[in-house]
Swiss-Prot record:
GO terms for molecular function: electron transfer activity; FMN binding; oxidoreductase activity, acting on NAD(P)H as acceptor; oxidoreductase activity, acting on NAD(P)H, quinone or similar compound as acceptor. Pfam families: Flavodoxin_2 (PF02525). Its EC number is 1.6.5.-, 1.7.1.17. Binds 1 FMN per subunit. The gene is azoR. Homodimer. This is FMN-dependent NADH:quinone oxidoreductase.
Amino acid sequence: MSKVLILKSSILGGYSQSAVLIDHLASHWENQGAAITVRDLGGKDVLPMVDGEIASGLRGGAELSARQQEMLALSDTLVAELKANDTIVIAAPMYNFTIPAQLKNWIDFIARAGVTFTYTETGSKGLVEGKRAVLVTTRGGAHKDGPTDHVVPYLKTVLAFIGITNVEVVYAEALNMGPEAHDKGMSEAKHSIDLLTA
């Protein structure tokens, strides 16, 4: 049975368009028998902002404060969750041309030297290999393949850095450019999901 980790990152709750698409995707895979874990980074599973104390603690060590120990344990949980699943689905709405801070927090918690990547004499090497990732990205405007899209290139870079290079992308564009454009963007995205999950 396939195991899927879904990361929601919208802060819009019931108004989230990325959540609508993620739920559409999840229903397909659930019907196919996949085991799905959902982490709502913009809602009930929001993570603490990584500050200097937390970042230092994530490097480990013998003399960690109670807060650092707690955050290191949280990071270990998130990394184990990432490694335990075959497919990682990331809901990535575009906020001011980039990803939500809540999703960036998750990245900061799981991107750890010696744990999800390592450095060699020839550069970095990802340690989370053999996985598939699906990015579901929603935007108010039209940014696909253009210089204003800092969502997909960034996430592909992060995923490749930790070893995940099999990445598929579902775009929902122009969602704030009028009712017709919204409906067209959502319809095309759902069609892409239908093909991806068939």
